[in-house]
Design a protein with these regions (language model features):
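Conserved N-terminal phosphate-binding loop of PLP-dependent enzymes in the Aspartate aminotransferase
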Residues: 1-144
Length: 144
């Protein structure tokens, strides 16, 4: 279904072209700016705190948060849990992809240039998606 149609994720942002090198250099310059680094720290803290609150709501479903700055892995109790959350996020306009090495884990990467108001909306949608995925799993278990 939907994962084969809409679930593709590309891996290389700057690979394979000279123009990619120019874009990569500009990206490094932007990432080195003090205001960018300051915002990354703010967003990372905010995202971590909000996700911890969501995890407290679903402790038996949303079982782990792995975080390094704005790169996160969200771990779910179901063997394919991240796929459920990924689909509900996608339906709510948020792109994240499950880990092919461990489909319990969702790769969640908000980005370094995220504005606080966008982060808040993204996290509201994430909380909704996690809740919907949890309800879906519970309904499947009851039906089985």
């Amino acid at each position: 279904g939907w994962l084969n149609e809409d679930g593709f994720g590309h891996i290389s942002t700057f690979g394979g072209a000279e123009l990619g090198c120019i874009a990569a250099l500009k990206t490094l310059e932007i990432c080195s700016r003090e205001e960018t680094r300051s915002m990354v720290h703010y967003i990372a803290d905010y995202v971590g705190q909000r996700l911890a609150a969501v995890q407290a709501t679903y402790p038996d479903w949303f079982v782990g948060i792995r975080q390094n700055g704005v790169i996160l892995g969200l771990e779910f109790a179901h063997p394919q849990g991240a796929k459920y959350v990924m689909r509900h996020l996608y339906e709510n306009g948020v792109w994240a992809i499950f880990s092919t090495l461990d489909p319990r884990v969702l790769q969640y990467k908000p980005g370094i240039l995220l504005k606080p108001e966008v982060a808040e909306e993204m996290l509201d949608r994430t909380e909704l998606a996690i809740g919907k995925a949890y309800a879906e799993i519970r309904n499947e278990r009851r039906s089985a």
